[in-house]
Amino acid sequence: MEATSSALSSTANLVKTIVGAGTLAIPYSFKSDGVLVGVILTLLAAVTSGLGLFVLSKCSKTLINPRNSSFFTLCMLTYPTLAPIFDLAMIVQCFGVGLSYLVLIGDLFPGLFGGERNYWIIASAVIIIPLCLVKKLDQLKYSSILGLFALAYISILVFSHFVFELGKGELTNILRNDICWWKIHDFKGLLSTFSIIIFAFTGSMNLFPMINELKDNSMENITFVINNSISLSTALFLIVGLSGYLTFGNETLGNLMLNYDPNSIWIVIGKFCLGSMLILSFPLLFHPLRIAVNNVIIWIEITYGGANPEEDPQVSEYTRASNLRPISMTVEDPAQPSDALDATSYNEQECLLPNGNFDNGSIESQENNNDERGTMAVAGDNEHHAPFVKSRFYWITALLLISMYTLALSVQSFALVLSFVGATGSTSISFTLPGLLGYKLIGLDSLAIGKMIPPKDRFYKRCSLLLVFYGLSVMFLSLYVTVFNRSDEA
């Protein structure tokens, strides 16, 4: 698949993946945290999530062809037996959040235009289904840009309302009496809402498709996209979070739009923008969901179905990926003179070191009928995920959409389910898995050619290990808070 994506379109897609409807819940989190702690938590989430994206990008460069990067491929290089588990984490995360978007669409549009909740959920399929059928993430750039305009309007609305009320002197009492500038307002509330901010920057599910489709997928350009995306997302979260909290103080609600006058034309437009943003964000979650489901299906075929790699090209690609090893090795032929072997090894190393950079990958020894010595062949030119063949792309798409719409039409609240989704799925793909992959892969390129790991890579490996412990801590704390709150409600 030809790489056509620019840094601008990749930034738009990544920002739109990160920033969703949860933005309007951040002021509510600030109400419990206070201004100082809320800002610190936002910056902490930005740094840790950005580090996770950067580590994954570094891991992609350990492949001979970085355009083949995916969670699936890297897990097969490092933890083959755990690959299905991480795909399941991706499925849980994307399916759960996508489902919540459909539920919110059904709750939002009837208040704007009338009609039944279920009617609007079904009507959203007119836009969602065509966008879910595109095969390249870059083809969603225009819908992402439209979604960003909708998000920009909401952010400007929240900020301008704060400035307008401040100018009229309406906020004097709130700023003096309600706002906690330096201390935590509600410690129990902090534990209940901290996951809103921590998980706000989840966007790693679309990082690898972005890397694979970038025209210039150098580490510098990828870092540029990540830094811009995290910076823009952080700015939006802080603007909405602080402006919303400083405007309403202790009256701030979980959905900030409910704090405003529902009859105001500006608020009506804002709610319409929110609904549009939900519809346009759905395909960005569906894209990695479909890939993860395909990977799990093929793994089941191999493990329990007795599939034959020689007969099924999908199974063949999966099996080939599962046999990959991250360290390249040369193959010695006893009949070959040592000086010829040295020259061959040097030439092989040159092939594996484009532009002076070693890319880890699997090296398979193949027998050349025209040459007695072993030759090296690179395994890694397969798709960046287990490929879709024949009609599988379409029936996976159909089954997922039917199941998600059926659940959205039949159940109106997924609050508890989404709490567990955030605690497990988000932490796995944002912190734990990037940390595990980074600790295993970063620096292996230097070791493979007999060099010491550079100090910078050693630093990244330590950061990766810290990211694992950070992710596990966040996961267990989030699960504890979810169960604790549930027991209190009971």
Swiss-Prot record:
Q: Which GO terms describe its cellular component?
A: fungal-type vacuole; fungal-type vacuole membrane; plasma membrane; vacuolar membrane
Name the domain of life this protein comes from: Eukaryota
BP terms from Gene Ontology = amino acid transmembrane transport; amino acid transport; regulation of sporulation
Disordered, as annotated region = 355-374
Q: Where is the composition biased (Polar residues)?
A: 357-368
Q: Which residues lie on this side of the membrane: Cytoplasmic?
A: 1-6, 56-84, 130-143, 212-221, 286-397, 450-463
Quote additional remarks: Present with 195 molecules/cell in log phase SD medium.
The task this protein performs is described as: Probable amino acid transporter of unknown specificity.
What is the name of this protein? Vacuolar amino acid transporter 7
This protein's species is Saccharomyces cerevisiae (strain ATCC 204508 / S288c)
Q: What is the lineage of its organism?
A: Eukaryota, Fungi, Dikarya, Ascomycota, Saccharomycotina
